[in-house]
Amino acid sequence: MFDTHCHLRFPDYEPLGGATKVLDRATEAGVRGAITIATTVEDARRSADLAESDDRLWHTAGVHPLYSDDSGALDELKAIAERPKCVAFGEMGLDQHYAKPNQDIQIASLEGQLERISRWRKDGLAKPIVIHCRKATADLIPRLNDSGLPADQFVFHCFTGTPDEARAVLDFGAWISFTGVVTFQNAPEVARAASLVPNDRIMAETDAPFMTPAPHRNIKPNEPKFVVHVCEALAKIRGCTPQAMEELLDTNAERFFGITLPDSPRAF
């Protein structure tokens, strides 16, 4: 297994021994690696340092919409994205669940990042893009489309929308990634959405320290080791074995992010 999206620099992990100990527990569970996702420019810089210290870890470079009022140094993302363990830009996008930062600030941050990514791509710095979308599908997809960037280079992480919203993302041409929400009994629409995604455009993640999956929902913080439960849930929803689901998810992660996972024991 592989956790395509977590936040190992968050202070939640300090009482647990830090990122290395968290990754050790993931390895014991058959999770072969993870991507620690940036939320600010400084977080991206420190995430790069962390990833370069552990063969099981990669990182991204981007500004989260809920931190978009701190977007004054977007040009600095280029140097971070050029570092050897950076596999994507992001996470970036729109979040309409919270009132702050307001939508104008979020949009300015998103469009500023997309404009730079498009320009850097023409200069040879081409990486996929991790998208945060919360209650904003109808507003976000047109902005991504207007960027001119290839639709298949976007992944909508932590999908919590409806089947119709999943179809909109798929019609646009992007990928969809699922968290422990697919294990929640009170989220049947997310499970139905997960059944719709083609084999070649689905991924799994924890979004740790958030979204701990069943049967461990009361455990905080969430950890990359629990991505195995996301895999099991997706296998059940999609009518295949956990082994087949793990192989598919690992292959997709390697293909989308351009990485080779460590040759270590699998979860299933």
Where are these regions (language model features)?
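Mid-domain alpha/beta scaffold segments of enzyme catalytic cores
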Residues: 1-268
